[in-house]
Amino acid sequence: RDLVRSRGLGDVYKRQALARAEEDKSIDGLLILLNTVGGDVEAGLAIAEMIASMRKPAVSLVLGGGHLIGVPLAVAADYSLIVPSATMVIHPVRTNGMFIGVAQTYRNMEKTQDRITGFVSAHSKITKERLEELMLDTKMLVKDVGTMLDGPQAVEEGLIDEVGGIARALEKLNELMKKAAGTEN
C-alpha cells in the first residue's frame, strides 16, 4: 500500500497530496499522524474539510500535541485515536500582528471560532456548548484561557474516539478499509 507523505512542505502541498490520495486507486485508506501546536486556521480547516469529505476511510492518531487547529484535523477522520500522553489544547482563536481594534474585527474572529467549534462538534461526540466551555475556561492555563486535555480526558470529553497507539490505529484503518471494500460492488 502506498502512503502519502507530506513533511512540512506547506498547506498547499498537503491539500494536493490529499487530492492525489483520493484519486489514486492503489490507496485504500488514509492514516493521519498528528503532532501540531496549532497554526493557520484557514489552512487547517481546509485540510480538515478535505479529510472529512474523502470517500476513502481515514483514521487519525494524535501522537503529541493537538492544539486548536489540530483538533479539527483529528476529528475529521472517520475514527480518531490518541496516545495516553498526548495533549489537546482547546483555546479561543488567537491572532498576532496588527489588527484594527473595532467590533467588526471581534465579530470576524468570533465567526472563525464558530466555524471551528461547529466543525468539531459535527465530527465528534462533544457538543458545541461543552467545547466552548472548555475553550473559555480561565482556571487551567496560567495567564491564558482554555483547557489542556490528555489522551484519556480527550476521549472522556467525546473529542476523540479511543486511546490507542500505532498498532491500534492501523488495526482500525484495516477494519474500515475491509468494510469499505465490502460495500463497493
Question: What does each model-identified segment do?
Answer:
Residues L9, A77-D78, I160:
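Short, well-ordered alpha-helix to beta-strand connector turns
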Residues K14, I32, A74, I116, ...:
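Terminal peptide-recognition signature
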